[in-house]
Amino acid sequence: AERLLFVFGGGACVGADVTRKALKALGAASFTTYAGRGIVGTDDPLHFGAALSQPSSADVIGSADVVVVVGSELAEVDLWRAHLGHQSLLVRVDIDPQAFTNTDAGVLNILCDGPLLMRALLERAEAMDKSASGWSADEVAKSRAVWRADTDAARPGIALLCDALREVMPDDTMIYSDMTQFAYVAQDVWPMTKPGHWHHPYGF
């Protein structure tokens, strides 16, 4: 795949270091769900962030030639739409067979532990010396800028408050949010350096 895209959910939080190395070795782009924030490093130029709820993220996903979803049920509160947006092969990876609810044609379900898969892909990519990418850092940065502007326009001023608060918070702060405007914006614009450090009541 030239435009390989991963989506990481909360079930992929273990082994983030290996996941980050695998993404780089594969030249892959990525999204996370809200529960998966922090799995991908904030310095990864091909990371689109936790932006699946942005309507135009479906267009980005549709431009990938393979989409791999690891450790996520793709909940309604992550997408806010009926379809992820993929136009090619979708691979679902999970240890829970009940997560394989997608009945679309062209879906490959793999019952497997996500971290084990990422380690295997890393080893394979390094053996093949596969690091070229069909994605560019510029297109990712442009998408992220548009999505931040859209979020700020919908709830003005909160994104700047998020930036200011994040500047004075330790990286290992454990955050628990509730159903507030601040939390909704922060989930979109607050980059996490570690997985499993922001907890929000999904599926209420």
Briefly describe each language-model feature range:
Residues 10-12, 36, 72-75, 180-182:
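Short glycine-rich anion-binding loops that position phosphate/pyrophosphate groups of nucleotides
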Residues 1-5, 61-63, 164-173:
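Glycine-rich phosphate/diphosphate-binding loops that line cofactor/substrate pockets in enzymes
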Residues 139-204:
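Active-site diphosphate/adenylate-binding microenvironment
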Residues 15-35, 173:
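Redox- and metal-dependent alpha/beta enzyme cores, enriched for Fe-S-associated oxidoreductases
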Residues 9-16, 154-159:
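Active-site glycine- and acidic-residue-rich loops that bind
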Residues 34-138:
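Glycine-rich, acidic loop regions that bind phosphate or pyrophosphate groups
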Residues 2-14, 176:
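Glycine-rich phosphate/diphosphate-binding loops and the adjacent beta-loop-alpha structural elements
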